[in-house]
Each structure stands twice: as structure tokens, then as C-alpha cells.
Amino acid sequence: MLKIRLKRCGRKKQTSFKIVVMNNLDKRDGQAIEELGFMNPRTKEKYLNINKINHYLRLGAKPTKTVFDLLNKAKII
């Protein structure tokens, strides 16, 4: 089953997250199928590739709770 979730990246105590599509059995920092955007919680900067996100949602990918909240704020879902 595909999940749209956050993948941690960045330096220690300066984290940022990539929004990726992964198999739900893979590790959090494992290999992603595709990157859909990024989010930096420290600077509130974020980028979402809406076309790719909608494509994977149509294929049946389920967003995690945090990603679901991000998509709601961006009015994608």
C-alpha cells in the first residue's frame, strides 16, 4: 500500500522534511518512490507539487495524518 508521508532530512536540530510517496512497509528514511515536495517547519517554508500529489491520491495512496493536515491547509484535499 502506498503512503504519502514525511521523510526527514537536514542537519541535527535543523531538520526539514521531504514529502514523498513510499510503500507503507519501508523505513521512514528509506528509498522513496517519488518526491512530491518539501517542508521546513523552522522557516514555515513549503512546496507541494499539486499535480503529482493528485496523481498518487487517484492511484490510492493514503496520506499520513501530518501530510493530510498539510494538504488540508493548502486546500488540495
Curated annotation (Swiss-Prot):
Location(s) in or outside the cell: Plastid, Chloroplast
This protein's GO CC annotations: chloroplast; mitochondrion; small ribosomal subunit
GO biological-process terms attached to the record: mitochondrial translation
GO molecular function: structural constituent of ribosome
Pfam families listed in its UniProt record: Ribosomal_S16
Keyword field: Chloroplast, Plastid, Ribonucleoprotein, Ribosomal protein
Family of this protein: Belongs to the bacterial ribosomal protein bS16 family.
Note in the entry: Although originally identified as Cyanidium caldarium, these sequences derive from Galdieria sulphuraria.
Protein name as catalogued: Small ribosomal subunit protein bS16c
